[in-house]
Regions:
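Short, glycine-rich nucleotide/cofactor-binding loops
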Residues: 17-37, 59-66
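C-terminal structural segments of small proteins and small subunits
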Residues: 98-117, 122-123
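Single conserved hydrophobic/aromatic residue that forms the stacking wall/gate
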Residues: 1-11
């Protein structure tokens, strides 16, 4: 689908979902991983074709909450029509239920549905 944001056109790929399960990217040094995940989410904002949905679960749920270094970029993606969904069980586990700052709360049924009904799952 397409949308107009300001004077720019954004295109969302209905067949792509990004899944983020940690507040860092990759294995090894966790601080480096936090820099990498921030860079990955920023890079998504610069793509010509945006994913339809970004799913956050487990430690990834922290990225959609207060004090996350990725909030500005996630809000930009949401403003361009990307659906941002965070696991409610995960927010509760980390004590972040009241700290969600972008997107909406979802459940594992919806996460499973989104992941099984698309052709492309991107997991950084």
């Amino acid at each position: 689908s397409e949308c107009l944001v300001g004077s720019e056109m954004c295109i969302r790929d209905r067949n792509t979902v990004v899944v983020i399960s940690a507040d860092h990217m990759g294995e090894g040094d966790e601080e480096l991983g936090k820099v990498l995940i921030k860079g990955f989410i920023y890079a998504l904002t610069e793509q010509d074709v945006l994913p339809q949905t970004i799913l956050f679960y487990n430690g990834g749920a922290k990225l959609t909450c207060e004090e996350s270094p990725t909030l500005e970029d996630l809000k930009s993606l949401e403003a361009q029509g990307v659906e941002i969904l965070t696991c409610g069980t995960c927010l509760n586990h980390y004590g972040l239920t009241d700290k969600l700052q972008v997107g909406s709360v979802t459940n594992m049924y919806v996460i499973a549905e989104k992941m099984t009904q698309v052709g492309n799952i991107v997991k950084p």
